[in-house]
């Protein structure tokens, strides 16, 4: 009997350890670590609990929950006081069934089904469909190739079809209405002519291009008015195809005599020796742009060479020493730096000193104390 209280005390100690919470104690002190008014153990008790504003999952369990992506069973999970509870073994029977909202595959079988992506063979005769492929007699290669141009039944069949009466590739389809045309009883809608526009787009039958102008010719839509100054002028009959109407000017009595061909440059020259037939004049500039006849490039410098205006001004040859002296001189056309000096100039990138004499004088008048102090330093 004395051993029983000892066992009870040990069991109480185990229960106390199972329900114990983690506490962080500070070395040298017996008090648990606090965060504000709460201990760390008290704060960690709610780590696995969703706060109330998001709902409450305390005491909840995921028992009997389906996996991710499993459709919800809305047939057996209905809670109602009028319905009897379904036993567990009955519930487990429906796990392999598709729910009624998606249809049902109960009593279904995949027997005889082909693999995924396998084409369906619907060309076999009905009496041989149930035979296994191993029981079928092999076909000759000639018989197999006879069906290469046949579309299978699942897509329809083109057997005994013909392209008779079909139009060529890219030809627009003419879906004409099958009706009786009282005005044109000889017109057959089933076999329209290639040169005729079908009726749904209008028709050009009996049409003519008589009186039509050529391609690219501008249309002359003149106003039908009576010209009191020229009563003989008729807008409908007076306009000739070769005459420009008066509103754009007139080319009446005009001539193209002496005109050059299309795209040919005009030669406004007075010298008959300059001609496109004379190869000697191919390098000449025509008079309308000036002329370079008898011109020469003698004494011209190369491309990019600066002009030496000093040499041209003196009109003589310079010695080698004098030519070297003028290499640092900017010619007159760009200005003149002769006699200049860089004395007092700052280095490259140095800020400019804008405190000139005028600004310094204003500064001395406004700040005399600082001006005297600067003079004392000197």
Curated annotation (Swiss-Prot):
At which residues are the Calponin-like repeats? Answer: 50-75, 98-123, 151-176, 197-222, 244-269, 285-310, 330-355
Q: Name one GO biological process term.
A: actin filament organization
Q: Provide this UniProt record's keywords sorted from A to Z.
A: Repeat
* KW Repeat (keyword) present: yes
Task: Output the Gene Ontology cellular-component terms.
Answer: actin cytoskeleton
The Low complexity compositionally biased stretches are: 1-20
According to the lineage, what is the superkingdom?
Answer: Eukaryota
The tissues where this chain's protein is expressed are given as:
Found in the longitudinal muscles below the hypodermis.
Q: Which residues form a coiled coil?
A: none
Keyword match Electron transport: no
Could you tell me where the Polar residues compositional bias lies? 238-256
Instruction: Identify its protein family.
Output: Belongs to the calponin family.
Task: Outline what the protein does.
Answer: Could be involved in muscle contraction.
Misc note: There are apparently several forms of the native protein which appear to be expressed in a stage-specific manner.
Q: Which PANTHER family match?
A: CALPONIN (PTHR47385), PROTEIN UNC-87 (PTHR47385:SF11)
Protein name, please? Calponin homolog OV9M
What species was this sequence derived from? Onchocerca volvulus
